[in-house]
Amino acid sequence: MVSEGKVVVLFVFDSQRRLSFDYRREYAKIVGVQRRFTQIDVFSGKPYRGNPVAVVVDCDGLDDGEMQQFARWTNLSETTFLLPPTNPVADYRVRFFTPIEELPFAGHPTLGSAYAWLIYGGTPRNQNTIVQECEVGLIHVNRDESLLSFAAPSLLRGGSVEESVVGEAAVSLGIDREAIIDSAWIDNGPGWLGVQLASAEQVLAIKPQKTNLTLGVIGAYPAGSRFAYEVRAFFSSGGITVEDPVTGSLNASMAQWLIGAGRFAPPYLVSQGKVIGHAGEVHVSMDETNQVWIGGEVTACIQGTVEI
C-alpha cells in the first residue's frame, strides 16, 4: 500500500497473482476536485426533447483552460460553471462555454444554471426572482409553478444588415434572397443575425448550407395555430453548419427586434427544434415596463459529480 497525499492506493493481487488497483479517498476533503454536476433539459415539458446544458456547480479553483477543456469534452452547445457572485445583489455568478469559446451570455444555459442552483440548495434573496451575474451584467430569472423565465438583456449590436450579408445569409440557408422579408443584427452575446421569412412552413423547409454566420430564422404559423412562430438557429462549428435545438438568447433578441418594430404582439408561444427531432416550446412575454421575458419548462435529467 502506498499513500500519496490524501489518496490511498492499494495494490491488490487475486488468486492468480494478477495485479489490480483500488484507489480510495482517505478524506472527504479530497473533493477539492470532485464537483456537483447536473445536465438540464430546457424549453420542453418532455424530458430529452428540449436543449441540454451541462452545469458544474462548485467551480472555485477552476481556471479558464480547465473550464474550456471540460466544455470541449461534454461537446454540448454550452456548458456552464457556477461561482460565488462578485456583485452583492447577485445570487450566483455563471460562465458560459461552448466547445470552442466562452460566451458573454446564453439563454437556455441561463435557465438551466438557475435551475441547477436551486436544486442544489440555492435560496434566492427574493422569493420568486433569482439574480444571475454573468459577463453582460445581472440577469433576472423569475420562477412560477411551471416555468423559469429570464429577462432579455439589452442588445450588444442591433440595426440593419448590409445587403451583401443578407445575400450571404440567403445562400447559407439555401433560399432565394427574395424569400427574406426582413433582417437585422440582433446580437445579445452569441452574434445573432435575425432573418424573417413569410411563414413557418418556409422556415421548416430550410436546408442549410455551409455558413460563417450565426443565423436565427423566424416565420409565422397561420392564425389560430397552437404556436405563433417557428424558429430555427444555425451556426458554424469546426467548419460544419450546426442547428441548435432550442435557443433562448435568439428568441430573446428576435422578440426585442420584432416586438419593437410593432410586428409581433406578446405574449406568444414559439416552436423550435421540430426538424431535428426536438419539441422546444419557448414562452415569450412582456411586462408593464416593456421588459421582454423568455420562459420554458426545465427538467434535471442527470445528477451526480464530476472530477475536474
Language-model regions: role of each:
Residues Y27-F105, L111-I308:
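Active-site proximal loop and beta-alpha junction motif in alpha/beta enzyme cores
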Residues V2, K6-D14:
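Hydrophobic alpha-helical signal peptides and transmembrane signal-/tail-anchor segments
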Residues F11-F13, F21-Y23, Y27:
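Aromatic (phenylalanine/tyrosine) cluster motif
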Residues S3-G5, E26-K29:
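Generic short amphipathic/hydrophobic targeting helices enriched at N-termini
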Residues V7, L19-S20:
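N-terminal amphipathic/hydrophobic targeting modules at extreme N-termini
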